Amino acid sequence: MRHRKNKHRIGRYGSHRRATLRNLSREIVEHQSIITTTKKAKAVKEYFEKLMTKAIKAKKAEKKEREVALRREIFKALGDRRLVNKLVDEIAPKYLDRQGGYTAIYKVGPRRGDGAEMSLIKLVIEE
């Protein structure tokens, strides 16, 4: 029984779910917004916000060793050095004073082919 197991499963087994979340996170870093199903958007929001928190901590790190360790953790999640640098050096500085809530989900209606509920997930940009 799955009582009190609150992980977003998105209809996939473990390694497939991790790969999906990794790919969606990479797309968010690269394009700052993506359109996906609402369930996947909610799952990737949780995953990506943890990465964003690590990126902000890496940017604020006083010791070089701590920054390198956090960058390696982000690399483990994203798998691309270029995206790690973009996240830590370009995106994270915009959110240094923000305590979470780095992404927002907006519903955009049903998908044409099968009627699945689609959502836009994007980085929140403060002016």
Swiss-Prot record:
Pfam families: Ribosomal_L17. InterPro entries: Ribosomal_bL17 (IPR000456), Ribosomal_bL17_sf (IPR036373). One of its GO terms (molecular function) is structural constituent of ribosome. Keywords: Ribonucleoprotein, Ribosomal protein. Gene3D superfamilies: Ribosomal protein L17. GO terms for biological process: translation. The keyword Transferase does not apply. Coiled coil: none annotated. It comes from the Bacteria. One of its GO terms (cellular component) is cytosolic large ribosomal subunit. Belongs to the bacterial ribosomal protein bL17 family. Part of the 50S ribosomal subunit. Contacts protein L32. This is Large ribosomal subunit protein bL17. It comes from Thermosipho melanesiensis (strain DSM 12029 / CIP 104789 / BI429). The gene is rplQ.
